[in-house]
Amino acid sequence: MPEPAKSAPAPKKGSKKAVTKTQKKDGKKRRKSRKESYAIYVYKVLKQVHPDTGISSKAMSIMNSFVNDVFERIAGEASRLAHYNKRSTITSREIQTAVRLLLPGELAKHAVSEGTKAVTKYTSAK
């Protein structure tokens, strides 16, 4: 006799959707598909900047769309740059150039410096 399906614990605020098993008519279990999102990362940054501020699900959805859009723009531009230079690999140099081309003035400078800092931290941790 099959055991009854146990529901997964409630996800933390801003985390991915919990995977729960649902019963079909024929008794087989089917997993819900996971929805990938930047929500947990947006939430972590929000708490670093404004610890006492929350975010609505609609605002989180907008932030998720924004991050996806910026990611696609940078990836597309970096891909174009690699293609122009007859390269098959997108390196940090292509990403940096794409950021300089896409973001305006001071924002590009800050993004490049933060990116360089992140790459340095990553390589030193290896």
UniProtKB/Swiss-Prot annotation:
It is found in: Nucleus; Chromosome. SMART domains: H2B. GO terms for molecular function: DNA binding; protein heterodimerization activity; structural constituent of chromatin. Glycans are attached at S113. Residues 1-35 are annotated as: Disordered. Pfam families: Histone. There is a cross-link at K121 (Glycyl lysine isopeptide (Lys-Gly) (interchain with G-Cter in ubiquitin)). The modification Phosphoserine is found at S15. The keyword Kinase does not apply. The keyword Ubl conjugation applies. Residues 1-12 have a biased composition (Low complexity). GO terms for cellular component: nucleosome; nucleus. Keywords: Acetylation, Chromosome, DNA-binding, Glycoprotein, Isopeptide bond, Nucleosome core, Nucleus, Phosphoprotein, Ubl conjugation. Monoubiquitination of Lys-121 by BRE1 gives a specific tag for epigenetic transcriptional activation and is also prerequisite for histone H3 'Lys-4' and 'Lys-79' methylation. Phosphorylated on Ser-15 during developmentally programmed apoptosis; which may facilitate apoptotic chromatin condensation. Core component of nucleosome. Nucleosomes wrap and compact DNA into chromatin, limiting DNA accessibility to the cellular machineries which require DNA as a template. Histones thereby play a central role in transcription regulation, DNA repair, DNA replication and chromosomal stability. DNA accessibility is regulated via a complex set of post-translational modifications of histones, also called histone code, and nucleosome remodeling. The nucleosome is a histone octamer containing two molecules each of H2A, H2B, H3 and H4 assembled in one H3-H4 heterotetramer and two H2A-H2B heterodimers. The octamer wraps approximately 147 bp of DNA. Belongs to the histone H2B family. PANTHER family: HISTONE H2B. This is Histone H2B 1.1. It comes from Xenopus laevis. The lineage of its organism: Eukaryota, Metazoa, Chordata, Craniata, Vertebrata.
